[in-house]
């Protein structure tokens, strides 16, 4: 069996930043305890379990406001997906110490929404309903942000203003966003469009579209709640023409998928620990369809290998530089 190791894959800088911020919090004796994360720091249960092992507790729920109601004391970390100003204000009003791990790319989109609101625009935001990033985007300017996920949502819009700005969730499929933006342009010809697929998401999607073409199947390693992981599987099917299977870790890999395969492509979501991908690759490298002794799939739970090992003293400066770069038109 030939294994196509799609590159790039796995952790993006936003995920790494958020994890380092949370790890640093665990090492700071001056922060009020307990330390909670408002939702999953990134959408991967292996990561949240690893943080719980060092005293950083995930509190989850339907939305950020609801989750915050469950936290009464200590420190709260806002996840990489971002939160609305009202959630931040509520946390402060409750007397909680707050730490913001929002990805700079997401912050840039939120800032853009505020700028366009101040300039008198109605904002159409393309995103996945129920995902925390669009929740935060809508909450940034609820009077002018209109969340759409499908063409039916766009059909239902009734906007009288000619000043319309269109942007999107950073982890969407770039092809889906382009399709919906084209549809929006047909209904609102004067709309200004600004695609905000983050570069890490885009290059991972493009890699799958190109590198999975010759594979018999693609294995996408990532949490079932990860939107960017779902989009990678979608890209494999729709753009590379290769069937795809999503697994959280090696224990979910079905032998039936691979026993007759000649080429297997492997990629991973931006919130997937490298250790989990390595286990899949090592298994495939030794797999022999004719030898059942090679079929055993085991996950070695090693939290130390999932969590970042060192503090990054330049973290705040690096994040500020990234935000400035995006504001100046960078990608």
Curated annotation (Swiss-Prot):
List of residues binding (2E)-4-hydroxy-3-methylbut-2-enyl diphosphate: 43, 81, 131, 170, 226, 228, 271
Catalytic activity, as annotated: isopentenyl diphosphate + 2 oxidized [2Fe-2S]-[ferredoxin] + H2O = (2E)-4-hydroxy-3-methylbut-2-enyl diphosphate + 2 reduced [2Fe-2S]-[ferredoxin] + 2 H(+); dimethylallyl diphosphate + 2 oxidized [2Fe-2S]-[ferredoxin] + H2O = (2E)-4-hydroxy-3-methylbut-2-enyl diphosphate + 2 reduced [2Fe-2S]-[ferredoxin] + 2 H(+)
Chain positions recorded as dimethylallyl diphosphate binding sites: 43, 81, 131, 226, 228, 271
E.C. code: 1.17.7.4
Single GO biological process annotation from the record: isopentenyl diphosphate biosynthetic process, methylerythritol 4-phosphate pathway
Pathway membership, UniProt: Isoprenoid biosynthesis; dimethylallyl diphosphate biosynthesis; dimethylallyl diphosphate from (2E)-4-hydroxy-3-methylbutenyl diphosphate: step 1/1; Isoprenoid biosynthesis; isopentenyl diphosphate biosynthesis via DXP pathway; isopentenyl diphosphate from 1-deoxy-D-xylulose 5-phosphate: step 6/6
Active site (record annotation): 133
Binding site for [4Fe-4S] cluster: 12, 103, 198
GO cellular component terms attached to this protein's record: cytosol
Ligand binding (isopentenyl diphosphate): 43, 81, 131, 226, 228, 271
UniProt keyword annotation of 4Fe-4S present: yes
Function comment: Catalyzes the conversion of 1-hydroxy-2-methyl-2-(E)-butenyl 4-diphosphate (HMBPP) into a mixture of isopentenyl diphosphate (IPP) and dimethylallyl diphosphate (DMAPP). Acts in the terminal step of the DOXP/MEP pathway for isoprenoid precursor biosynthesis.
Full protein name: 4-hydroxy-3-methylbut-2-enyl diphosphate reductase
């Amino acid at each position: 069996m030939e294994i196509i190791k799609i590159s790039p894959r796995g952790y993006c800088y936003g995920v790494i930043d958020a994890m380092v911020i949370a790890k640093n919090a665990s090492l700071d004796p001056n922060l009020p305890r307990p330390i909670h994360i408002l939702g999953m720091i990134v959408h991967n249960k292996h990561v949240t379990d690893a943080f719980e092992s060092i005293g950083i507790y995930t509190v989850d729920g339907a939305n950020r406001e609801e989750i915050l109601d469950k936290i009464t004391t200590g420190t709260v970390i806002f996840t990489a997906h971002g939160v609305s100003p009202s959630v931040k204000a509520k946390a402060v009003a409750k007397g909680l110490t707050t730490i913001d791990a929002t990805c700079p790319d997401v912050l840039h989109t939120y800032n853009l929404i505020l700028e366009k609101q101040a300039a008198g625009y109605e904002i159409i935001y393309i995103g996945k309903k129920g995902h925390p990033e669009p929740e935060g985007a809508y909450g940034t300017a609820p009077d002018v942000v209109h969340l759409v996920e499908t063409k039916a949502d766009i059909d239902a819009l009734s906007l009288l203003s000619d000043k319309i700005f269109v942007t999107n969730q950073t982890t969407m499929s770039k092809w889906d966003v382009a399709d919906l933006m084209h549809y929006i342009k047909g209904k609102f010809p004067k709309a200004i469009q600004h695609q905000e697929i983050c570069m890490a998401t885009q290059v991972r999607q493009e890699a799958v579209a190109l590198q999975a073409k010759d594979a018999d199947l693609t294995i996408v390693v990532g949490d079932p709640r990860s939107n960017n992981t779902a989009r990678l599987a979608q890209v494999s099917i729709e753009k590379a023409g290769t069937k795809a299977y999503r697994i959280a870790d090696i224990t979910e890999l079905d032998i039936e998928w691979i026993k007759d395969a000649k080429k297997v492509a492997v990629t991973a979501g931006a919130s997937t620990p490298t250790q989990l991908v390595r286990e899949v690759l090592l298994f495939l490298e030794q797999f022999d369809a004719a030898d059942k002794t090679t079929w055993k799939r085991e996950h070695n739970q090693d939290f130390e290998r999932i969590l970042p090992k060192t503090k990054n003293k330049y973290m705040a400066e690096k994040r500020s530089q990234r935000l400035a770069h995006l504001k100046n038109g960078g990608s």
